[in-house]
């Protein structure tokens, strides 16, 4: 016979049935309890004590719990690990409940919807995607700031890249995923996948500026958030359309290899461009700076607008210093506005709002003193919101606690009735003191005192030795080992007045605070607009501080130009780490007629640094930053493509060579004549001749069909002869100094090809044994004196091009065109290559 389930456990099971994919925290008194499998798993993850309910029954129910006051800490840990948490609250006072206490889930917290994050700086983006007619829509929002955007994309690879750039932890899908897509999201990107296929009619977004698919994706994202948060989301901004092409396009591999916002070793900020440029003083400014680095501009007018303000701040040191001090007093307005909207704002949040608003007049005044045209628009957007600051300053006490139940929140003079209750409490305290003094005098008991606790209320404390002097109008309340507690009619009357005043005072203060919170909601839009303006000012002052500190110059950007001319250029991050004295600057020149720069030279000589230096300089210029150079004339690039380093994707089964070819293919397919391509040692992941042949073919293809500015570093010295065949290719190399058998890398880029590779010298620097190095040198001499193998191209032969196709080339081309390479697995791609090889 099955054991009977208690009403409480039945209530738990009924609620759990609606949230099978979440840990259910079930409020019971002062604890949140977990049961069954949730309890077992949570006990292990959170290191909780696993106990059981109905221990003496045949099948005790596993149980674990956390104190309600510490629940946020445990919830955050579960969410950080990628789990969902459903919180079921008591919906009525247990003392007043008839039968079982009513409970209901009030919020589902997920990796993409948490707003109480310990890291108050980084965004926490929740992404939704939808699909129709071979097109994808991607919408994202940050619940903690209210940001809400959407775009449409043509390829799944672009969707993946955008999600990776956003550093999302959860994705809401509006259509059934196939197995390959699930694998990408779950295994490779470690995303929590949630589903939202339906859109409630009242949540359907139909904005004219969005496509039908964009409206659909944004609606499904909004529906998911409403379903999980179960509250008003007044802080959410109207969904905004954006286009990838409106920014300098870089895929995630490029951003990663250039270490723009996260270093490759630890996936942290230190040693990145973000780390270097971040002299921001506000949380909003820090987030905005990261987004600027992630999405550089392609509009020259927008770039120049930023640079002009950076120049103004650079030219006015003292005003900038005052501005920085004012910015330091501004708290995270975006997150504070969100906490108000979510009903989670506590008294200290309002004090931070008031303090932030009190600094706005100072910021505005500094911009007025500067009186520069570029600052006019920003100055006009600085809304002091005097109504809100006045409301908070009149209502909230400067010494208010973090909680809304401890009292002392509302200022004296804000509410007449509250002041009366407080006066009664103060009078009661003086009445107690007077009564204590009177009874001491009447009874002659010098040690008599009036104390208070929750159980006995107010009482007279009398020690054992003085009990003979207790007056008749005292009555016993409690007996202790060495003393007794007594009451009196007068003390009871005073206590009743004080308790009533305390209860009514606490209740009224709570109501007044909740009213203030509700009234503040009407200012959320203005707070968010103010936050955006302050963030922009903060970013621009940050760029000016870095420019001054590092000795950067304002670059010249020319729309439509194809000339690159950088004098004394440096790698911004390497210089910051090493120090300017140690860094060797280099010129970078790609005149109108030069598209490709073929770079040769030994390992460790600085080829990769030189190429990264160029890419970072372009990115810095196009976010509106000054750049590390003596002079810099640049075109405006539409995209940057890189293949740098051996970033094997072993998790997905892709080798170095497959990754090389995939990234090269991405550049070849997407680059335009306005793009920048950087290839570092392309082809080294396969056999020498295969690699060399592919490298040459790719160079030829870029030269003949794309015309993008390209830096191509290689160890294949045979490729340097291409300058005789390709009009728009120049050779450069990293200079070395060879003296008495020792080689010094000068880290200086010089015209012409390198004449040696110095591989043995690099091995010597790495510390290989001397006998091994001597043997390698002997083998090298033999190889250099050995006749060239027949396989090698003879001097008199024409240099081969991989784009001279076989007779059946049209058939092969049609086969290639029929493949969707973005959705092919590594195995499928290799099988297809073998099939093509067999058909040649």
UniProtKB/Swiss-Prot annotation:
<dbReference type="InterPro" id="IPR007696">
    <property type="entry name" value="DNA_mismatch_repair_MutS_core"/>
</dbReference>
<dbReference type="InterPro" id="IPR036678">
    <property type="entry name" value="MutS_con_dom_sf"/>
</dbReference>
<dbReference type="Pfam" id="PF00488">
    <property type="entry name" value="MutS_V"/>
</dbReference>
<dbReference type="Pfam" id="PF05192">
    <property type="entry name" value="MutS_III"/>
</dbReference>
<keyword id="KW-0234">DNA repair</keyword>
<dbReference type="InterPro" id="IPR036187">
    <property type="entry name" value="DNA_mismatch_repair_MutS_sf"/>
</dbReference>
<keyword id="KW-0067">ATP-binding</keyword>
<dbReference type="GO" id="GO:0005524">
    <property type="term" value="F:ATP binding"/>
</dbReference>
<dbReference type="Pfam" id="PF01624">
    <property type="entry name" value="MutS_I"/>
</dbReference>
<keyword id="KW-0227">DNA damage</keyword>
<dbReference type="InterPro" id="IPR017261">
    <property type="entry name" value="DNA_mismatch_repair_MutS/MSH"/>
</dbReference>
<dbReference type="InterPro" id="IPR005748">
    <property type="entry name" value="DNA_mismatch_repair_MutS"/>
</dbReference>
<comment type="function">
    <text>This protein is involved in the repair of mismatches in DNA. It is possible that it carries out the mismatch recognition step. This protein has a weak ATPase activity.</text>
</comment>
<dbReference type="GO" id="GO:0030983">
    <property type="term" value="F:mismatched DNA binding"/>
</dbReference>
<dbReference type="GO" id="GO:0003684">
    <property type="term" value="F:damaged DNA binding"/>
</dbReference>
<keyword id="KW-0547">Nucleotide-binding</keyword>
<dbReference type="InterPro" id="IPR007695">
    <property type="entry name" value="DNA_mismatch_repair_MutS-lik_N"/>
</dbReference>
<dbReference type="InterPro" id="IPR000432">
    <property type="entry name" value="DNA_mismatch_repair_MutS_C"/>
</dbReference>
<keyword id="KW-0238">DNA-binding</keyword>
<dbReference type="Pfam" id="PF05190">
    <property type="entry name" value="MutS_IV"/>
</dbReference>
<dbReference type="GO" id="GO:0005829">
    <property type="term" value="C:cytosol"/>
</dbReference>
<dbReference type="InterPro" id="IPR007861">
    <property type="entry name" value="DNA_mismatch_repair_MutS_clamp"/>
</dbReference>
<protein>
    <recommendedName>
        <fullName>DNA mismatch repair protein MutS</fullName>
    </recommendedName>
</protein>
<comment type="similarity">
    <text>Belongs to the DNA mismatch repair MutS family.</text>
</comment>
<feature type="binding site">
    <location>
        <begin position="601"/>
        <end position="608"/>
    </location>
    <ligand>
        <name>ATP</name>
    </ligand>
</feature>
<dbReference type="GO" id="GO:0006298">
    <property type="term" value="P:mismatch repair"/>
</dbReference>
<dbReference type="InterPro" id="IPR027417">
    <property type="entry name" value="P-loop_NTPase"/>
</dbReference>
<dbReference type="InterPro" id="IPR016151">
    <property type="entry name" value="DNA_mismatch_repair_MutS_N"/>
</dbReference>
<dbReference type="InterPro" id="IPR007860">
    <property type="entry name" value="DNA_mmatch_repair_MutS_con_dom"/>
</dbReference>
<dbReference type="InterPro" id="IPR045076">
    <property type="entry name" value="MutS"/>
</dbReference>
<dbReference type="Pfam" id="PF05188">
    <property type="entry name" value="MutS_II"/>
</dbReference>
<dbReference type="GO" id="GO:0140664">
    <property type="term" value="F:ATP-dependent DNA damage sensor activity"/>
</dbReference>
């Amino acid at each position: 016979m099955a054991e009977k389930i208690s009403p409480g456990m039945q209530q738990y099971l009924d609620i759990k049935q609606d949230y099978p994919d979440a840990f259910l925290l079930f409020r019971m008194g002062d604890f949140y309890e977990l049961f069954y499998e949730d309890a077992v798993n949570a006990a292990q993850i959170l290191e909780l004590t696993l106990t059981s309910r109905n221990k003496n029954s045949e099948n005790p129910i596993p149980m674990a719990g956390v104190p309600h006051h510490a629940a946020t800490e445990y919830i955050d840990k579960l969410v950080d690990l990628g789990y969902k948490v459903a919180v079921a609250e008591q919906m009525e006072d247990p003392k007043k409940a008839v039968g079982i206490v009513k409970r209901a889930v009030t919020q589902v917290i997920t990796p993409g919807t948490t707003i109480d994050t310990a890291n108050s700086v980084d965004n926490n983006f929740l992404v939704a995607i939808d699909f129709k007619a071979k097109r994808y829509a991607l919408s994202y929002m940050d619940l903690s700031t209210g940001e809400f955007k959407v775009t449409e994309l043509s390829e799944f690879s672009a969707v993946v890249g955008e999600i990776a750039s956003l550093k999302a932890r959860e994705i809401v899908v509006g259509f059934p995923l196939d197995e390959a897509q699930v694998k990408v999201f779950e295994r490779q990107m470690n995303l929590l996948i949630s589903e939202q296929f339906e859109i409630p009619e009242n949540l359907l977004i139909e904005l004219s500026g969005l496509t039908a698919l964009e409206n659909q994706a944004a609606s499904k994202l909004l529906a998911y958030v409403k379903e999980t948060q179960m509250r008003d989301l007044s802080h959410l901004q109207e969904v905004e359309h954006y286009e990838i092409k409106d920014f300098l396009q870089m895929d995630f591999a490029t951003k990663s290899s250039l270490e723009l916002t996260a270093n490759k070793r630890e996936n942290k900020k230190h040693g990145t461009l973000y780390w270097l440029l971040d002299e921001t003083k506000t949380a909003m400014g820090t987030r905005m700076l990261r987004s600027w680095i992630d999405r550089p501009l392609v509009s020259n007018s927008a770039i120049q607008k930023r640079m002009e303000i950076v120049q103004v701040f650079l030219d006015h040191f003292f005003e900038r210093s005052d501005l920085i001090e004012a910015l330091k007093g501004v708290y995270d307005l975006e997150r504070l506005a969100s906490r108000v909207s979510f009903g989670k704002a506590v008294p200290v949040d309002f004090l931070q709002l008031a303090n932030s608003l009190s600094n706005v007049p100072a910021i505005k005044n500094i911009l007025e003193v500067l009186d520069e045209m570029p600052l006019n628009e920003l100055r006009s957007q600085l809304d002091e919101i005097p109504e809100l600051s006045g409301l908070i300053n009149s209502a909230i006490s400067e010494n208010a606690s973090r909680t809304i139940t401890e009292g002392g929140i509302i200022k004296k003079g804000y509410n007449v009735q509250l002041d009366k209750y407080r006066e009664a409490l103060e009078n009661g305290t003086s009445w107690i003191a007077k009564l204590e003094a009177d009874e001491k005098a009447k009874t002659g008991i010098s040690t008599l005192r009036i104390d208070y606790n929750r159980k006995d209320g107010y009482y007279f404390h009398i020690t054992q030795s003085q009990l003979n002097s207790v007056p008749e109008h005292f009555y016993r309340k409690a007996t202790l080992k060495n003393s007794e507690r007594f009451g009196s009619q007068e003390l009871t009357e005073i206590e009743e007045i004080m308790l009533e005043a305390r209860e009514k005072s606490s209740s009224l203060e709570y109501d007044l605070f909740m009213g203030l919170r509700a009234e503040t909601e009407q200012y959320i839009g203005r707070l968010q607009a103010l936050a955006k303006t302050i963030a922009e000012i903060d970013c621009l002052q940050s760029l000016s501080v870095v420019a001054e500190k590092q000795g950067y110059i304002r670059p010249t950007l020319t729309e439509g130009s194809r000339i690159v001319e950088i004098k004394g250029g440096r790698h911004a991050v390497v210089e910051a780490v090493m120090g300017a004295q140690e860094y060797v600057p280099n010129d970078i020149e790609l005149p109108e007629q030069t598209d490709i720069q073929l770079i040769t030279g030994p390992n460790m000589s600085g080829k990769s640094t030189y190429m990264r230096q160029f890419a970072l300089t372009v990115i810095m210029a196009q976010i509106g930053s000054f750049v590390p150079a003596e002079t810099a004339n640049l075109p405006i690039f539409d995209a940057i493509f890189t293949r740098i380093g051996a970033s094997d994707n072993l998790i997905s089964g892709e080798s170095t060579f497959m990754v090389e070819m995939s990234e090269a293919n991405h550049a070849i397919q997407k680059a335009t004549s306005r793009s920048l391509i950087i290839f570092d040692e392309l082809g080294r992941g396969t056999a020498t001749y295969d690699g060399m042949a592919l490298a040459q073919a790719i160079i030829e293809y870029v030269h003949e069909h794309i015309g993008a500015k390209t830096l191509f570093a290689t160890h294949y010295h045979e490729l340097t002869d291409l300058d005789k065949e390709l009009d728009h290719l120049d050779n450069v190399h990293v200079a070395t100094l060879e003296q008495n058998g020792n080689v010094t890398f000068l880290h200086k880029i010089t015209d012409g090809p390198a004449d040696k590779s110095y591989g043995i010298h690099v091995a010597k620097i790495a510390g290989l044994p001397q006998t091994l190095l001597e043997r390698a040198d002997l083998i090298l001499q033999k190889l250099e004196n050995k006749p060239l193998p027949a396989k090698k191209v003879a001097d008199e032969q024409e240099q081969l091009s991989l784009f001279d196709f076989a007779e059946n080339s049209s058939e092969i081309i049609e086969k290639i065109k029929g493949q969707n390479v973005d959705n092919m697995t590594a195995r499928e791609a290799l099988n297809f290559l073998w099939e093509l090889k067999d058909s040649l």
